[in-house]
């Protein structure tokens, strides 16, 4: 399972907020909702967040093994 816990720490230390992501950087409120609820994001959105926050992918998301993961 992918979680976005690192994103919230990165956002806090960046000087940005969910408001500025939406208003200044055109990140949708539905994307913010997906981040809040650990829902899937596409790689373009992850790339945009990394660019806006000047960070690496691992500063946005973390993989955590879960019993709920789909069996391959």
Question: Where do the protein language model's features map onto the residues?
Answer:
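A short, Lys/Arg-rich alpha-helix, primarily the initiator
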Residues: 1-20
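Short alpha-helical DNA-recognition segment
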Residues: 15-33
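Short, charged recognition helix plus adjacent turn
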Residues: 9-10, 61-72
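Short, basic-rich loop-to-helix N-cap that marks the start of a DNA-contacting helix
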Residues: 39-51
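The DNA-recognition helices of helix-turn-helix-type DNA-binding domains
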Residues: 28, 39, 64-67
């Amino acid at each position: 399972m992918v979680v976005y816990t690192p994103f919230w720490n990165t956002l806090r230390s960046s000087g940005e907020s969910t408001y500025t992501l939406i208003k200044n950087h055109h990140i949708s409120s539905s994307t913010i909702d997906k981040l809040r609820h650990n829902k899937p994001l596409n790689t373009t959105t992850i790339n945009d967040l990394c660019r806006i926050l000047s960070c690496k992918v691992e500063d946005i998301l973390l993989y955590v093994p879960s019993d709920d993961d789909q069996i391959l």
